[in-house]
């Protein structure tokens, strides 16, 4: 099992925003988190590599296990978690003062101890795969939103994660670039990596999901295979899909 979440509860201050979350994903699954704004999708995905720290529950992901009531007690374990579980943010978070290739090689050299030559070789292979090799020496400022998003995906893949998390990867991208990101997610499926994707775009979800998690108000309302799109089991999900 690549991901197992058990009885996860999350609070912002005194306000509870995730309630008793339970979910599992097999290796190679592409799990899509759907739901209206405020459902808790982005909070949930950020708990999967402890960017947000739950109050209670259990998390097992990419062979890292945490009792969430004291998850921050072991900084080394968290560092390992973040090597094994990559994250692609909605806002890209590229370092503006570094070129594309420098953005890619920074973490592998500092965190994994990879040599500069090896890191650059890996980076150029990834950039070719994502059709970005001609941008290697450009700065993020000179890239389009779609190019920045693909560079952000490449940067996350440089750490060779077992699980990759995407928070709204196609938000604010035009249809052509959205299609490119969908193609990348499909290509990654063939490598066996496990992916978790937050999106509000049902058509994107339908193209990539092997597993669907529908949320409202911090709770999982429906969970199942991609068949859920054709045969939703709950009125809430049926209503969501009809809009």
UniProtKB/Swiss-Prot annotation:
Catalytic activity field: a polar amino acid(out) + ATP + H2O = a polar amino acid(in) + ADP + phosphate + H(+); L-arginine(out) + ATP + H2O = L-arginine(in) + ADP + phosphate + H(+)
GO molecular function: ATP binding; ATP hydrolysis activity; ATPase-coupled polar amino acid-transporter activity
Entry-linked SUPFAM superfamilies: P-loop containing nucleoside triphosphate hydrolases
Entry annotated with the keyword Plastid: no
Record domain ABC transporter: where: 3-242
Classification via PROSITE patterns: ABC_TRANSPORTER_1 (PS00211), ABC_TRANSPORTER_2 (PS50893)
Major site of localization recorded for this protein: membrane
Residue numbers binding ATP: 35-42
Cellular localization per UniProt: Cell inner membrane
Functional description taken from the UniProt entry: Part of the ABC transporter complex ArtPIQM involved in arginine transport. Probably responsible for energy coupling to the transport system.
Family that this chain belongs to: Belongs to the ABC transporter superfamily.
Subunit (UniProt): The complex is composed of two ATP-binding proteins (ArtP), two transmembrane proteins (ArtM and ArtQ) and a solute-binding protein (ArtI).
Record protein name field: Arginine transport ATP-binding protein ArtP
Lineage summary: Bacteria, Pseudomonadati, Pseudomonadota, Gammaproteobacteria, Pasteurellales
């Amino acid at each position: 099992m690549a991901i197992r979440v058990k009885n996860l509860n999350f609070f912002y201050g005194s306000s509870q925003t995730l309630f008793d979350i339970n979910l599992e994903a097999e290796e190679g699954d592409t799990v899509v988190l759907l739901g209206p704004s405020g459902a808790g999708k982005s909070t949930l995905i950020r708990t999967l590599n402890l960017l947000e720290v739950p109050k209670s529950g259990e998390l097992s992901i990419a062979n890292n296990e945490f009792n969430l009531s004291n998850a921050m007690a072991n900084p080394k374990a968290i560092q390992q978690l973040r090597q094994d579980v990559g994250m692609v943010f909605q806002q890209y978070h590229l370092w503006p003062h570094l070129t594309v290739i420098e953005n890619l090689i920074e973490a592998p050299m500092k965190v994994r101890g990879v040599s500069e030559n090896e890191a650059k070789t890996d980076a150029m292979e990834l950039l070719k795969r994502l059709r970005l090799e001609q941008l290697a020496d450009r700065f993020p400022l000179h890239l389009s939103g779609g190019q920045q998003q693909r560079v952000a995906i490449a940067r996350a893949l440089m750490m060779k994660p077992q699980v990759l998390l995407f928070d709204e990867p196609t938000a604010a991208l035009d249809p052509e670039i959205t299609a490119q990101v969908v193609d990348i997610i499909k290509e990654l499926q063939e490598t066996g990596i496990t992916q978790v994707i937050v999106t509000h775009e049902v058509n994107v979800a339908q193209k990539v999901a092997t597993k669907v998690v529908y949320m409202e108000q911090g709770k999982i309302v429906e969970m199942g295979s991609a068949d859920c799109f054709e045969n939703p089991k709950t009125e809430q999900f049926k209503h969501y899909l009809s809009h």
